[in-house]
């Protein structure tokens, strides 16, 4: 998925 789940805009 995303490599930065702590960034909702990633």
From Swiss-Prot:
Modification D-tryptophan, positions: 6
Primary location group: secreted
Post-translational modification Cysteine amide, affected residues: 10
Keyword Secreted annotated: yes
Location within or outside the cell: Secreted
Domain of life: Eukaryota
Cellular component, GO annotation: extracellular region
Keyword Acetylation: no
Residue list for modification 4-carboxyglutamate: 3
Alphabetically ordered keywords of this record: Amidation, D-amino acid, Disulfide bond, Gamma-carboxyglutamic acid, Ion channel impairing toxin, Neurotoxin, Secreted, Toxin
Tissue: Expressed by the venom duct.
InterPro entries in the record: Contryphan_CS
Cysteine disulfide links: 4-10
GO MF annotations, alphabetized: ion channel regulator activity; toxin activity
Protein family: Belongs to the O2 superfamily. Contryphan family.
Domain notes: The cysteine framework is C-C.
Stated role: Its target is unknown, but this toxin may modulate voltage-activated calcium channels (Cav) or calcium-dependent potassium channels (KCa).
Protein name: Contryphan-Ar3
Taxon lineage: Eukaryota, Metazoa, Spiralia, Lophotrochozoa, Mollusca
């Amino acid at each position: 998925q995303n490599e930065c789940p702590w960034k909702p805009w990633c």
